[in-house]
């Protein structure tokens, strides 16, 4: 209601003058009009609402009715109000935050103080509404109930008019109370949503301001933007409520003292004593929650790593290791959650416990002092204490909100005070100079704000937000710095690039080469401004485009990935597609360039991802191009086409910096730089450097394969065949080679071309509104997970006994008053008069007192037992569901991970687990307490005043209609909110992956804009969901006000046969029921909504189909299998899913034991699919693979995969130590580890690290270069001692020299093994025994490389010719 308009983001106008009150609060003042005269066309109906519509949530009624009649979707709901939008509120919050920092500095700045300033006007208005509500709430039970009871016990029945007036007054106060209460929540919800969107947007903007991230982990960011932002939402809702407690306590204390005397102070004291106890419990809860959140971050981070590295984990059969790791972390998390749960459960139970203790102690003390007590006084005090119970009842909500918000604000402040370093990039003075580095010495940024990390964690974690699945994460621009390991592991940052000096003029092509870890990618990072300049100058002129070493692909279609926010120009776009060799790929995709690319490009091959990344750069039409090894993932034909058509022709006149390991391309560069150990070793033209016969010339000789068996003869033959073919023919072949099938190692959709304007069935499955609908099966699953029906029944019994004891105490007091009071009613002159003896009888044996005190003790005892039992049960359920879902997902086939976005899975394991761990128990506990209290109230009222049930039955029809509409609407809105959260999650993770690319193309604003759109969409659905709860609550309250009025009339007008104590009990209970019934229904609905998370997890338990494990057949497999390593494919066919084309079609081949086979073919020919088949990541459509006379389908998956070894195309390292990455199972000695490190030329690098084998490996292994990561993966493979080795482009990220050394190592280390090598660089397969050439999933050639090279029409000879011709 109250707040700034969408364009008034501060109190000052552009000239610095303070805005007038009317200007700042114009929208809010319009809302103050009781009834707006006519409907307007605001995007959100709340902006057209008058005060009555706003306070009663009537503006939401059309949405509720629509939800009952039709299924709601994201598109059918109105958008978020502009006044509540991310953009406006983030700007306003930022102004206040900057003022705070300017005033006290970043370290002393209080984010909590800024939050208060941001919402104080609205909070004050909320408090005013709450105070008015509390005054009305206290007035009814204290004054009016007392007057009504006094009236019926001491006044003759002839004065009916007074009784009716008192009843009308009671109805008025109760109705006004619920109206002010609804108004307070209406204000609160919009306040909370504004705070949520403001801070989440500001956090995201701040994270995106960094070019590299060093101060936060991936697990933290997911938790902060999901759980923490929601914690602030709840804090904004509940924190203002305690402000009314002092007023309520004073009013009730004064009146209690007035009607009861000094003994009323006993009950008041009980409340006052318990309030600091709750505050202490809040502090304790905050401590436990803070500890639990840090463990949750670790679990989410490890889960993220698992999901993004799932392919390698499956190939290495490490599922059990990861399951144990996750389960161990979960156990630690559960222990901390248990402690927090005990405290929280105690807080929740305090309301009924404190109320009972206060009432019992007050009356017991009163009676022992032999003070007089009548029914009007007793039940007025009870009604008043029940009103005071509100102060204790709301405190658990407020305490929990404050505890969690304090933790969240601390985490958020850490992000907000972190500032990106100033840019060191300057502008060259000469306009013809595009790049200028003069004596530039650079280092990686020192990590900050990670106090929790051990000293060894001072390693430079340069952009820890990227996904841990290396083949899918975005930028490897900072990777080549492993050679500087001892320097950047030290306490202060040391240089990685030393005294770099060179100049690149406009239109020139600079080639950069060097060994693994020499600093090539670091140099690109330096040009992007991602490092720290220690000395010298780095000058860059003009806008640039950047192609990272491993392509960043975001979720969207191909065209969106290429355009990257630029306007579509058909001619320019088609040309870009052609020169990047994508035309045939797009034609074969089911929807052309409108085909949806799965998250991280899951349905594309590595070469396709890289060419789309290159196409994005070409289409951007920039002056400077930084290309970090863009052609390593494509074969020779495609590489030649792209280099000739794209880099040499299309980019002619542009300035290009090309980092490459494919040294044949350097001949065409205007200048070449050779890096070694972060320094320029040689610099000049290709010709000059060759004439110098230095290190560069040696690298070129390595390229020519002088170490291979007679490769010169093979090359010479290929060259002869090349000369026979015209250049035009070769170019045409190169274009045709630009993409046969779409997907290599991933699933193709279909070969049939479909209308690109109507994509109907894309790869990534979207969540439907029906997913997550809560049914009885959901509760059944949850109950079974919690320990079974017996355990759940015992927990319910404890709730029953606790609330029953509380209700019994009040009922027993009524009995006591009934028996002990001498009330004589007689008819005199047609009037009924009652005289009361105001002293209680039968106190000498103290039976009534003892039973009364026993009821208090039982409430306390059952409350404590219930708290421990309920917390253990709910956490057992959430942990059981977590483990079951994780175990199901772990064993799902790769197709599941290809079609399910990681953002959606992370949503399940972060936000949904937070719901099950914390929020569901909290709501469920309150609901069960309220439910049993409602039941006991109805039972007692039926016993003492049965006519009340007739009144309730009369309004039951209206109640059921409301409930039906409400239940359906809330369920629909919760589904929509869940669905809209997943794209928001995916965008966050995708943006952090592509941080370097986003900055290079200057698309930060576009990325933030999309975040705001998705954030607003999800927040609007969250707001609608919560408003729907209040929509129902208000209408239920009004119904119960009518019931209260009717009961009050019946009490006033009823016959004298019903005792005064029964009437008093009925009135006090009906007042309590008036608010309690709607709270119970609403809390129950909220609890059911929280069960949506359980249902979403249950769906994975039911729908995740495990891989076909096929256990051993008895006697079919020897213990030492495979002993030889012979592989036979028999008529083998494979497709990724039903109704999709075959990716391997009728393979028949035999590979003898100990042979080395090079597998080559164009992009998408099925090379990587061969590896998927061998490891049974995909089951065959028909045919068999036989290894040493054993059909692999008869072997258990774990047994099969542990016997084979895969060295992946993209290196995968996990967070941990070097030792853990080499030997996760801990089954090898240190000596064995050093031996394999020496054989892979990594021993010296690891020896330089302070911790050596125990040195930390950061997320994605980013403290090692890509090449070094690959060498570590090679060392890992050597340890496994397998008879069959598959190398999938394993040396693509290595320079030719290291490649040569590694190839010789492979030949020596695996000489008794069968080795299959998938490669694009043909020099890596020339020394193989056999070469397997694939095309369209079929074997087209299979022979010795020299034999195939001598055949002029062989496909292998054409591939060689293309490479040699470069």
UniProtKB/Swiss-Prot annotation:
User: Which residue ranges traverse the bilayer?
Assistant: 125-145, 152-172, 235-255, 257-277, 349-369, 377-397, 788-808, 850-870, 931-951, 1038-1058
Q: Where in the cell is it found?
A: Endoplasmic reticulum membrane
Here the segments flagged for biased composition (Basic and acidic residues) are 726-748
Q: Where does ATP 2 bind?
A: 1161-1168
Q: Which GO terms describe its cellular component?
A: endoplasmic reticulum; endoplasmic reticulum membrane; mitochondrion; plasma membrane
Q: How does it sit in the membrane?
A: Multi-pass membrane protein
- The annotated regions of Polar residues compositional bias extend over 474-492
* Matching InterPro entries: AAA+_ATPase, ABC1_TM_dom, ABC1_TM_sf, ABC_transporter-like_ATP-bd, ABC_transporter-like_CS, ABC_transporter_C-like, P-loop_NTPase
Q: Which residues form the ABC transporter domain?
A: 459-702, 1127-1361
Question: What does the record say about tissue specificity?
Answer: Widely expressed at low level. Highly expressed in testis by Sertoli cells and Leydig cells. Detected in testicular germ cells and sperm (at protein level).
Where is the ABC transmembrane type-1 domain positioned along the sequence? Answer: 123-404, 792-1089
Task: Give any GO molecular function from the UniProt entry.
Answer: ABC-type transporter activity
Q: Which residues are glycosylated?
A: 439, 978
Annotated positions binding ATP 1: 514-521
* Record's keyword terms, sorted: ATP-binding, Endoplasmic reticulum, Glycoprotein, Membrane, Nucleotide-binding, Repeat, Transmembrane, Transmembrane helix, Transport
Q: Where is this region: Disordered?
A: 470-492, 726-749
Q: Which family does it belong to?
A: Belongs to the ABC transporter superfamily. ABCC family. Conjugate transporter (TC 3.A.1.208) subfamily.
Family annotation (PANTHER family): ATP-BINDING CASSETTE SUB-FAMILY C, ATP-BINDING CASSETTE SUB-FAMILY C MEMBER 12
Q: Tell me what this protein is called.
A: ATP-binding cassette sub-family C member 12
- According to the entry, what is the taxonomic lineage of the organism? Eukaryota, Metazoa, Chordata, Craniata, Vertebrata
């Amino acid at each position: 209601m109250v707040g700034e308009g969408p364009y008034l983001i501060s109190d000052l106008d552009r000239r610095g003058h303070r805005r007038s009150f009317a200007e700042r609060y114009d929208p809010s003042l319009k809302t103050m009009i009781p009834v707006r005269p006519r409907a307007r066309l605001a995007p959100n109906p709340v902006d057209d609402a008058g005060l009555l519509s706003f306070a009663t949530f009537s503006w939401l009624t059309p949405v509720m009715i629509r939800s009952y009649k039709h299924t709601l979707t994201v598109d059918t709901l109105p958008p978020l109000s502009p006044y509540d939008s991310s953009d406006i509120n983030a700007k306003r919050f930022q102004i206040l935050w900057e003022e705070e920092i300017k005033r006290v500095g970043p370290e002393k700045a209080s984010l909590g103080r800024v939050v208060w300033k941001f919402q104080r006007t609205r909070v004050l208005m909320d408090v005013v509404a709450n105070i008015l509500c509390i005054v009305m709430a206290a007035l009814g039970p204290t004054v009016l109930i007392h007057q009504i009871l006094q009236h019926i016990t001491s006044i003759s029945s002839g004065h009916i008019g007074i009784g009716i007036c008192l009843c009308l007054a009671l109805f008025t106060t109760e109705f006004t109370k619920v109206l002010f209460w609804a108004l307070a929540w209406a204000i609160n919800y919009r306040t909370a949503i504004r705070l949520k969107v403001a801070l989440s947007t500001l956090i995201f903007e701040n994270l995106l301001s960094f070019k590299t991230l060093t101060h936060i982990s991936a697990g933290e960011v997911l938790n902060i933007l999901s759980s923490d932002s929601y914690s602030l939402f709840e804090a904004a809702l509940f924190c203002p409520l305690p402000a009314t407690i002092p007023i309520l306590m004073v009013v009730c204390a004064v009146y209690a003292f007035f009607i009861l005397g000094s003994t009323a102070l006993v009950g008041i004291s009980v409340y006052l004593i318990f309030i600091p106890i709750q505050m202490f419990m809040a502090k304790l809860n905050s401590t436990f929650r803070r500890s639990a959140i840090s463990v949750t971050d670790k679990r989410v981070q490890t889960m993220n790593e698992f999901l993004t590295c799932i392919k390698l984990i499956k190939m290495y059969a490490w599922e059990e290791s990861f399951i144990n790791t996750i389960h161990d972390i979960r156990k630690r998390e559960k222990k901390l959650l248990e402690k927090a749960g005990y405290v929280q459960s105690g807080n929740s139970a305090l309301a009924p416990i404190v109320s009972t203790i206060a009432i019992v102690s007050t009356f017991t003390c009163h009676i022992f002092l032999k003070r007089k007590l009548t029914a009007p006084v007793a039940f007025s005090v009870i009604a008043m204490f029940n009103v005071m119970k509100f102060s204790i009842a709301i405190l658990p909500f407020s305490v929990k909100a404050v505890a969690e918000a304090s933790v969240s604000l601390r985490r958020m402040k850490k992000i907000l005070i972190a500032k990106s370093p100033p840019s060191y990039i300057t502008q060259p003075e000469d306009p013809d100079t595009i790049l200028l580095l003069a004596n530039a010495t650079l280092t990686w940024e020192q990590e900050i704000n990670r106090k929790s990390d051990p000293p060894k964690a001072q390693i430079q974690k340069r952009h820890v937000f990227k996904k841990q699945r290396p083949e899918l994460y975005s930028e490897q621009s900072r990777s080549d710095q492993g050679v500087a390991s001892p320097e950047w592991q030290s306490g202060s940052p040391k240089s990685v690039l030393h005294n770099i000096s060179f100049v690149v003029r406009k239109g020139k092509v600079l080639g950069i080469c060097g060994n693994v870890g020499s600093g090539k990618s670091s140099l690109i990072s330096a040009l992007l401004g991602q490092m720290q300049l220690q000395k010298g100058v780095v000058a860059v002129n003009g806008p640039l485009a950047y192609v990272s070493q491993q392509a960043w692909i975001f979720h969207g279609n191909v065209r969106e990935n290429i355009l990257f926010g630029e306007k579509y120009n058909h001619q320019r776009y088609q040309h870009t597609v052609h020169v990047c060799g994508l035309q045939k790929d797009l034609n074969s995709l089911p929807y052309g360039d409108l085909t949806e690319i799965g998250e991280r490009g899951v349905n594309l091959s590595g070469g396709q991802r890289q060419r789309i990344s290159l196409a994005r750069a070409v289409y951007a039409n920039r002056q400077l191009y930084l290309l970090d090894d863009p052609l390593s993932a494509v074969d020779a034909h495609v590489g030649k086409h792209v280099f000739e058509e794209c880099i040499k022709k299309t980019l002619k006149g542009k300035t290009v910096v090309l980092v490459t390991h494919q040294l044949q391309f350097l001949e065409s560069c205007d200048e070449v730089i050779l890096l070694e150990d972060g320094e320029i070793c040689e610099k000049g033209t290709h010709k000059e450097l060759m004439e110098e016969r230095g290190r560069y010339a040696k690298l070129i000789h390595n390229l020519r394969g002088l170490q291979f068996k007679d490769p010169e003869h093979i090359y010479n033959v290929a060259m002869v065949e090349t000369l026979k073919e015209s250049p035009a023919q070769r170019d045409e072949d190169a274009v045709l080679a630009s993409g046969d099938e779409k997907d290599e190692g991933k699933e193709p959709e279909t070969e049939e071309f479909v209308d690109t304007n109507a994509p109907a069935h894309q790869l990534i499955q979207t969540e439907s509104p029906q997913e997550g609908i809560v049914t009885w099966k959901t509760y059944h699953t949850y109950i079974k997970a919690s320990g079974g029906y017996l355990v759940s029944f015992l927990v319910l019994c404890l709730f029953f006994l606790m609330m029953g004891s509380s209700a019994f105490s009040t009922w027993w007091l009524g009995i006591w008053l009934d028996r002990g009071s001498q009330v004589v009613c007689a008819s005199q002159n047609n009037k009924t008069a009652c005289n009361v003896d105001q002293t209680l009888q039968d106190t000498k044996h103290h039976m009534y007192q003892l039973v009364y005190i026993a009821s208090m003790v039982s409430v306390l005892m059952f409350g404590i037992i219930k708290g421990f039992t309920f917390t253990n049960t709910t956490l057992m359920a959430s942990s059981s569901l977590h483990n079951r879902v994780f175990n199901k997902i772990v064993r799902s086939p790769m197709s599941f991970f290809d079609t399910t976005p990681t953002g959606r899975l992370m949503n399940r394991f972060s936000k949904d687990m937070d719901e099950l761990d914390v929020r569901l128990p909290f709501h469920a506990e309150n609901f069960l307490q309220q439910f049993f209290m409602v039941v006991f109230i109805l039972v007692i009222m039926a016993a003492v005043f049965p006519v009340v049930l007739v009144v309730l039955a009369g309004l039951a029809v209206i109640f059921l209609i409301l409930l039906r509409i409400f239940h359906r609407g809330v369920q629909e809105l919760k589904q929509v909110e869940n669905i809209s959260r997943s794209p928001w999650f995916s965008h966050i993770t995708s943006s952090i992956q592509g941080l370097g690319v986003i900055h290079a193309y200057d698309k930060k604003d576009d990325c933030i804009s999309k975040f705001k759109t998705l954030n607003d969409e999800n927040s609007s659905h969250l707001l609608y969901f919560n408003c729907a709860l209040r929509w129902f609550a208000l209408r239920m309250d009004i119904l119960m006000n009518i019931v209260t009025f009717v009961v009050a009339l019946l009490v006033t007008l009823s016959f004298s046969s019903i005792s005064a104590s029964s009437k008093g009990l009925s009135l006090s209970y009906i007042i309590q029921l008036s608010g309690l019934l709607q709270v119970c229904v609403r809390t129950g609905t909220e609890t059911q909504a929280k069960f949506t998370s359980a249902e979403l997890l249950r769906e994975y338990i039911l729908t995740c189909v495990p891989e076909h494990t096929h256990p051993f057949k008895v006697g079919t497999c020897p213990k030492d299998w495979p002993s030889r390593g012979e592989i036979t494919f028999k008529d083998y066919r494979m497709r990724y899913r039903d109704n999709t084309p075959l990716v391997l079609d009728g393979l028949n081949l035999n590979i003898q034991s100990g042979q080395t086979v090079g597998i080559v073919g164009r992009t998408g020919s099925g090379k990587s699919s061969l590896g998927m088949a061998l490891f049974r990541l995909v089951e065959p459509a028909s045919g068999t693979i036989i290894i040493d006379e054993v059909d692999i389908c008869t072997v258990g998956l774990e047994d099969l995969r542990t016997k084979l070894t895969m060295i992946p195309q993209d290196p995968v390292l996990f967070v941990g130590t070097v030792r853990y990455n080499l030997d996760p199972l801990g089954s090898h000695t240190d000596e064995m580890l050093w031996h394999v490190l020496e054989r892979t030329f990594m021993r010296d690098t690891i020896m330089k690290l302070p911790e050596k084998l125990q040195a930390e490996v950061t997320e994605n292994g980013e403290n090692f270069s890509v090449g070094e990561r690959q060498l570590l993966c090679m060392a890992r493979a050597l340890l496994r001692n397998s008879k069959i080795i598959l190398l999938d482009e394993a040396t693509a990220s290595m320079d030719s020299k290291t490649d040569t050394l590694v190839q010789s190592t492979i030949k020596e280390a695996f000489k008794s093994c069968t080795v299959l090598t998938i490669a694009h660089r043909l020099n890596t397969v020339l020394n193989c025994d056999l070469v397997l050439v694939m095309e369209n999933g079929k074997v087209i050639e299979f022979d010795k490389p020299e034999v195939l090279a001598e055949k002029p029409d062989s496909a292998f000879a054409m591939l060689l010719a293309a490479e040699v011709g470069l």
